[in-house]
Amino acid sequence: VRATVVGVLAGLVRWVGLAFALVLVIHVLLTVGRANPDNGITVFFADAAQPLALAFRSLFTPENGDLRVLVNFGLAALFWLIGSAVLARLIRRLG
C-alpha cells in the first residue's frame, strides 16, 4: 500500500509540474505569436502564468517585451519541469 501511495504522489507531483510548465509555455507562445490580448484564452493564460512565474517574472529586463516574456517565463517553465522531477524522485527514494 505504501509503495502505491508513494508512486501516486510522485506521479501527481510530476503532472502538476508539467501542467504549470505547459501554462507558462502557452503564455509565451501566445505573447510572442502576437495573439489578441483581449481574447479570453489569451487573458486566461496570461493571468494563470503570472503567479506560476514566481520570481522569474522580472529576473531579466531586456528592452524587447517578447524577449523578456520568452526568457523569464521560459526559465520558470524549466524550473517547474526540473523541480517537479527532482521532487518526484526524492519522494520515490524516501518512500
Residues covered by each model-derived region:
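Helix-boundary and loop/linker segments of multi-pass membrane transporters
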Residues: 1, 59-63
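N-terminal intrinsically disordered, cationic/polar leader segments
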Residues: 3, 7-13
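Hydrophobic alpha-helical segments of integral membrane proteins
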Residues: 12, 41-59
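N-terminal signal-anchor transmembrane alpha helix
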Residues: 13-34
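Hydrophobic, lipid-facing residues on alpha-helical transmembrane segments of integral membrane proteins
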Residues: 17, 48, 74, 78-86
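Alpha-helical membrane-inserting segments
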Residues: 25-29, 56-57, 83, 87-91
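Membrane-interfacial segments
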Residues: 33-37, 87-95
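Individual transmembrane alpha-helix segments
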Residues: 62-77
